[in-house]
């Protein structure tokens, strides 16, 4: 049984970027829910460190 967009919204399983609203390329680990572009912009201010 395939799930349509309408069904996913009803069950609350769709996620979007908290900052810009984009639905693709989400970083959901640790319930961050930011798209990868927004994550790259604000990761340092969230306490993440970049190694090499």
Swiss-Prot record:
Keywords of the record: Metal-binding, Ribonucleoprotein, Ribosomal protein, RNA-binding, rRNA-binding, Zinc
Protein's GO biological process: cytoplasmic translation
UniProt keyword annotation of Transmembrane present: no
GO cellular component annotations of the record: cytosolic small ribosomal subunit
Matches recorded under Gene3D superfamilies: 30s Ribosomal Protein S14, Chain N
A GO MF label: structural constituent of ribosome
Record: residues binding Zn(2+): 17, 20, 35, 38
Top-rank taxon, per record: Archaea
Subunit structure: Part of the 30S ribosomal subunit.
Similarity-based family: Belongs to the universal ribosomal protein uS14 family. Zinc-binding uS14 subfamily.
Summary of the function given for this chain in its UniProt record: Binds 16S rRNA, required for the assembly of 30S particles.
Name this protein carries in UniProt: Small ribosomal subunit protein uS14
Organism: Halobacterium salinarum (strain ATCC 700922 / JCM 11081 / NRC-1)
Lineage, highest ranks first: Archaea, Methanobacteriati, Methanobacteriota, Stenosarchaea group, Halobacteria
